A protein has these predicted regions:
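Enrichment for repetitive, rod-forming helical segments
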Residues: 47, 62, 79, 94-95
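Short secondary-structure transition/capping segments
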Residues: 46, 80-81, 122-125
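Extreme N-terminal segment that seeds HTH/winged-HTH DNA-binding domains in transcriptional regulators
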Residues: 1-35, 41, 89-132
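N-terminal helix-turn-helix
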Residues: 35-67
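Beta-hairpin "wing" of winged helix-turn-helix
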Residues: 29-30, 34, 59-71, 75-79
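Short, mixed-charge, low-aromatic patches
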Residues: 9-16, 49-58, 69-76
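Short hydrophobic/aromatic-rich motifs at helix boundaries and adjacent loops
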Residues: 10-11, 28-29, 44-45, 67-72, ...
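Short, cationic-aromatic polyanion-contact patches
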Residues: 14, 38, 72-89
Length: 132
């Protein structure tokens, strides 16, 4: 399976790659234990520099999203749970970015909540289809 990445100007590719991978893991596009593409393969597929890809994969390993098995490659790990305070902190950062972008676009809080509900439902359906 190939990771999907839509390059957004103004945001570091490293951050976009991390987000795309985490989204793929959470949505069930990649299953626990499934092989993850090598640095070279992923860099070639996404047309990004291998050093950026290497740093992103190493970050995902350190954060517990991936596991490296010498001789076998890198596989998807169980998503890290972290402490509730850590999870809230990570979410807060994303919410701040979402709020700024929504305001910039002139959207109301209702628009944002509705869009979030739709996306949440899509993730639930994708996970269900993936056999979770």
């Amino acid at each position: 399976m190939t990771l999907r990445l839509t390059i957004r100007p103004g945001e570091p590719i490293f951050d976009q790659l991390i987000f795309a991978a985490q989204k793929a893991f959470i949505s069930g596009e990649y299953q626990v234990g499934e092989a993850f593409p090598s640095v070279r393969a992923l860099a070639a597929d996404l047309n990004i520099h291998p050093s950026t890809t290497h740093k992103a994969i190493q970050h995902l390993i350190r954060e517990g999203w991936l596991e490296n098995h010498p001789g076998k490659g890198t596989v998807v790990a169980r998503p890290p749970q972290g402490r509730p305070s850590e999870r809230r902190h990570l979410l807060q950062h994303e919410v701040e970015q979402l709020a700024v972008e929504a305001k910039r676009l002139g959207l109301s809080m209702t628009d944002v909540v509705d869009a979030l509900a739709v996306q949440w439902s899509k993730l639930d359906k994708t996970k269900g289809a993936a056999g979770e």
